[in-house]
Amino acid sequence: MAGGKSPKGMFAARKLRLKRLKFRWHQRKFKRRMLKLKEKFDPLEGAPMARGVVLEKVGIESRQPNSAVRKAVRVQLVKNGRIVTAFVPGDGGVNFIDEHDEVVIAGIGGTLGRSMGDLPGVRYKVIMVNGVSLDALYKGKKQKPVR
């Protein structure tokens, strides 16, 4: 374990530990966590979900080699006023959403909190509309309340 410049003596534990702590700053995850970079730059401010108001419906062209228009919505977050694009999952899901509806968005589940699959630049997905889950609306278990 000890490298060429590492102390190898019987009482070298403190020195080895301090050296390890210093080199942790070269690790990307450690640096992001310690400097709280996610909370600073993430529109959701580190939270798993956020509430927002739908501004418009948009169609996003998928990346190569696929060819499709994926349905999404532009959402203005209540907590900080930032505008993000959120994917609407499911077949015909965008029909349940109108402008000025209140939606809850969550991360889409891409690597390192980034976009997923063939959706360029979309990091979030819609999970609730006006307090009713999108899943319940699909299955016909509940109807969307009129605001």
UniProtKB/Swiss-Prot annotation:
* Protein name, entry field: Small ribosomal subunit protein uS12
Gene3D superfamilies linked to this entry: Nucleic acid-binding proteins
The alphabetical list of record keywords is:
Ribonucleoprotein, Ribosomal protein, RNA-binding, rRNA-binding
User: What's its job?
Assistant: With S4 and S5 plays an important role in translational accuracy. Located at the interface of the 30S and 50S subunits.
Biological processes, Gene Ontology terms: translation
Matching Pfam families: Ribosom_S12_S23
Q: Name one GO molecular function term.
A: structural constituent of ribosome
Q: Describe its assembly.
A: Part of the 30S ribosomal subunit.
Listed under GO cellular component are: small ribosomal subunit
Q: Which domain of life is it from?
A: Archaea
Sequence similarity? Belongs to the universal ribosomal protein uS12 family.
